[in-house]
C-alpha cells in the first residue's frame, strides 16, 4: 500500500487548534492504573453522581479493589473474560477497573440484548462470569447452561441511589453487594501486563456482515485514544474540577473510552444517566452544571426542540461532542446559538477504540465532513478495486486509518483480521 505525497504531508495538522500537538508520547501502562493514579491524586473529589448519590475517587477505588480481590478468589485470572451487562451506573465503573486491574478482559454487553444475542457474545468470548442487573438476571440465566458462564453477579440501580435500596436476591445468582461485603481485606495480585499486546476489552461489533465480531482492544489502544481525545479539550481544564454528563452508554466503546476512561483520567465527576430521558438530562444539567457533554444526534435534536432548554442552564456547558452519525449544519448552528458552547463532531469505529477524527473547535466547519484525523493518526483513501492503491484527494474510495488506537484484531477470527488489517512497506498496520 503506497503512500501518496498528499496524504504523507498530513495537511490536516495545519488545522489543529493551537493547543493540540500533532505527536505525543502515549503511556505504555495498564489501563487499571488510570483509577489508581486519579484516586491517589484527588481521593476526596467526587467521582460519580447517580440518582441523588455520589462516590469519591477513593471510594470507587476501594470498592473496585474489593471486587478485584473477590474475582481472584473466584478464580478469574489474566486473560479470562468477564462480561458487564449494565446501564450507566457506578457499579460499571467499579467492575471495569476491577477486571482490568487483575488482568482480565472486559466484555461489554448491551443490556437491551435478547437472550439469543447475549448467548452469541457469551459463547464467542468464552466469558466465565457476567455482572448484570437483577432485572436482567432471567436473560442471563437463560444462556448460562449453553455457555462458559460459571457465575452471575447481580446488582440494582437502587443500591447506588440516595435511597440505597437493597438488591433483591435472585436464585442462581450472587448479589454484588454480598460479594463486596465478604471481602474484609483487599489483596490485589501483581499481574504482569504488556499494554501493547494484552487485550483489555472485547468490543463486539456487527460491522457490515451482521455477524458479531469481538474487536480486541489492548490496554495501549484505549489508553492512547484517551490521550488523543482529552488533549482536544481546552487547556484551561483542571483535573478534578470538570464534570462530564454521560447518557451515552458505557457498554458502547464511545461511552467506555470517552466517558468512563477519559473521565477517570481527567478526574472528572461522571454524571450518570442510566436511561435517556430529555427531562432527566436537562435536570442533571441544571443541578450539576457539567462542563463537557458527549452525545449523539438524536439527543441534541431533542434538546434543541425542548421549549424550555435554556431555563435549565444549558448555556453553562462549555463543550459538546457528537458521534455515531452526522449532524446537519443547521442543527449545529442552532444549537451553538442556543447554548453559546462549541458542538464538535467526531468519527470513529469500534476497531479504533473508537475515535479517529474530530472537528477542531476553532476552525471553520465543512458541512458533511467527519473532521480531521487525531494526533498520530494517519489516513488515506484507497481505490475500491484493489484496496491498496491510494487515490487522489477528492476521488471516491475506501478510508484507511493507522494509529496507536487501531485494534489488535478480531477475537478468534484470523481470516477476518487479515482482511481488515494490512501492513504497508514500513510495517505500519492499517485498518
Residues of each region from the PLM?
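ANL superfamily adenylate-forming
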Residues: 13, 52, 139-196
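Conserved AMP-binding/adenylate-forming core of the ANL superfamily
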Residues: 23-28, 36, 44-89, 93-97, ...
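Conserved ATP-binding/catalytic segment of the ANL
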Residues: 29, 74, 85, 392-394, ...
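Adenylate-forming
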Residues: 38, 48, 60, 64-67, ...
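Conserved adenylate-forming
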Residues: 71-76, 186-197, 202-245, 266-268, ...
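A short helix-loop-beta submotif of the ANL/AMP-binding
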Residues: 81, 87-107, 111-115, 123-129, ...
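Conserved AMP-binding/adenylation subdomain of ANL enzymes
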Residues: 223-243, 251-291, 306
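Gly/Ser/Thr-rich phosphate-binding loop
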Residues: 290-295, 304-365, 378
Amino acid at each position: 500500500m503506497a503512500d501518496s505525497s498528499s496524504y504523507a504531508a498530513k495537511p490536516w495538522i495545519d488545522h489543529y487548534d493551537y493547543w493540540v500537538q500533532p505527536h505525543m508520547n502515549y503511556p505504555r501502562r495498564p489501563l487499571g492504573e488510570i483509577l489508581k493514579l486519579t484516586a491517589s491524586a484527588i481521593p476526596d473529589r467526587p467521582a460519580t453522581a447517580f440518582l441523588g448519590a455520589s462516590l469519591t475517587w477513593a471510594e470507587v477505588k476501594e470498592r473496585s479493589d474489593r471486587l478485584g480481590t473477590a474475582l481472584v478468589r473466584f478464580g478469574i485470572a489474566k486473560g479470562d473474560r468477564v462480561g458487564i451487562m449494565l446501564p450507566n451506573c457506578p457499579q460499571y465503573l467499579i467492575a471495569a477497573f476491577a477486571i482490568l486491574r487483575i488482568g482480565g478482559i472486559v466484555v461489554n454487553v448491551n443490556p437491551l440484548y435478547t437472550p439469543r444475542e447475549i448467548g452469541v457474545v457469551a459463547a464467542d468470548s468464552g466469558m466465565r462470569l457476567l455482572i448484570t442487573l437483577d432485572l436482567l438476571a432471567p436473560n442471563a440465566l437463560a444462556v448460562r447452561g449453553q455457555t462458559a458462564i460459571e457465575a452471575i453477579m447481580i446488582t440494582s440501580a437502587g443500591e447506588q441511589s440516595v435511597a440505597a435500596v437493597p438488591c433483591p436476591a435472585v436464585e442462581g445468582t450472587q448479589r454484588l453487594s454480598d460479594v463486596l461485603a465478604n471481602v474484609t481485606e483487599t489483596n490485589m495480585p501483581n499481574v504482569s501486563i504488556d499494554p501493547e499486546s494484552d487485550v483489555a476489552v472485547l468490543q463486539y461489533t456487527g460491522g457490515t456482515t451482521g455477524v458479531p465480531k469481538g474487536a480486541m482492544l489492548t490496554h495501549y489502544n484505549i489508553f492512547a485514544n484517551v490521550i488523543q481525545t482529552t488533549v482536544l479539550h481546552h487547556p484551561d481544564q483542571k483535573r478534578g474540577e470538570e464534570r462530564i454528563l454521560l447518557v451515552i452508554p458505557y457498554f458502547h466503546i464511545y461511552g467506555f473510552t470517552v466517558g468512563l476512561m477519559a473521565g477517570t483520567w481527567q478526574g472528572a465527576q461522571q454524571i450518570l444517566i442510566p436511561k435517556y430521558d430529555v427531562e432527566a438530562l436537562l435536570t442533571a444539567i441544571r443541578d450539576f452544571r457539567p462542563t463537557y457533554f458527549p452525545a449523539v444526534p438524536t439527543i441534541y435534536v431533542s434538546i434543541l426542540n425542548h421549549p424550555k432548554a435554556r431555563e435549565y442552564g444549558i448555556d453553562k456547558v462549555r463543550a459538546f461532542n457528537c458521534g455515531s452519525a452526522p449532524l446537519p449544519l443547521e442543527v449545529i448552528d442552532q444549537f451553538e446559538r442556543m447554548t453559546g458552547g462549541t458542538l464538535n463532531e467526531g468519527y470513529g469505529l469500534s476497531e479504533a477504540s473508537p475515535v479517529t477524527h474530530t472537528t477542531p473547535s476553532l476552525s471553520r466547519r465543512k458541512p458533511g465532513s467527519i473532521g480531521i484525523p487525531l494526533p498520530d493518526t494517519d489516513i488515506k483513501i484507497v481505490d475500491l478495486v484493489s484496496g491498496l492503491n491510494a487515490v487522489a484527494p477528492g476521488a471516491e474510495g475506501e478510508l484507511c486509518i493507522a494509529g496507536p488506537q487501531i485494534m489488535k484484531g478480531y477475537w478468534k477470527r484470523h481470516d477476518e483480521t487479515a482482511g481488515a488489517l494490512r501492513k504497508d512497506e514500513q510495517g505500519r498496520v492499517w485498518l
